[in-house]
Amino acid sequence: RMAGNAVRGSPTWQSRYGSLMQHMFSASNVSCEIVVDGKRRTIFKDVSLAIAPGEIVDLVGPSGSGKSSLLTAFARLNPRAHGDFVLQGHPASAFTPQQWRARIAYLPQKPVLLGDCVADAIRLPYTLAIRQSATQANGRKAKPVELLPDVSIRETLDAIGCADIDLGRAPHDLSGGQAARVSLARTLLTDPKVLLADEVDAGLDDENADKVAAILERAALNGMAVIRIRHRPPDGRATRIMRLADGMLTQIENESRVEISNGGGIA
């Protein structure tokens, strides 16, 4: 899926691109505890992970192992987790929470699309940013449609394989696959450095799941670092597959060793 037929994660890919890779994001000593029935339960402890620009890292593991908790920890959205996080050489303490989340985007499993039409739903981050911004020199604030006109949205959707999605369509009229792709497109338009995709292909058929995966692959080819939770068989797009189980994060060296549970998910 890359130029010269260098498959992601293969020795050829590593030899061609591995020496060029520098960490976009790293996390170390990440731990998470919750309280259940008055007792503390450790979800994971002292987990570490680093990812380079252009990488796709798949995160697999049994249900309840803490995969979503780990991604929300990376996004600084998990108050029960703590650790040391570095983005492009700068510690998390150098960023406000808003600055951090603008650069490290967390995409939840279920799309949340608000607005009268697809275009409005995609412009939502710009709408919120304008509300928080200062008034311009001319005494007015820019309108979301001025910052992100329909033509720009249309170009982006077309470029990532979403030509079938009508900007004027109501979000609640979208199919599950279309809603997932619109949600992903909205996130990509904010241009994050790292994308944390929390099983965004859940509930989709194979065709739509592959469309979502292709969009993530394009983002990675443009330099974005992508971590995606998956409960599907390996699709050859990941540079690495990491397994979270029993509170520990380990790398799966051979894709053929990824276990598929009876329910069809990756264990």
Residue map of PLM features:
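Helix-to-loop junction immediately C-terminal to a conserved catalytic motif
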Residues: 75
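Conserved ABC transporter NBD signature motif
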Residues: 83-91, 100
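The feature captures the beta-strand-to-loop junction immediately N-terminal to the Walker
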Residues: 60-62
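Conserved ABC ATPase signature
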Residues: 170-174, 178
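Catalytic Walker B motif of ABC-type/P-loop ATPase nucleotide-binding domains
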Residues: 195-199
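Q-loop/switch helix immediately C-terminal to the Walker
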Residues: 116-147, 152
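Conserved structural motif at the start of ABC-family nucleotide-binding domains
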Residues: 25, 44-46
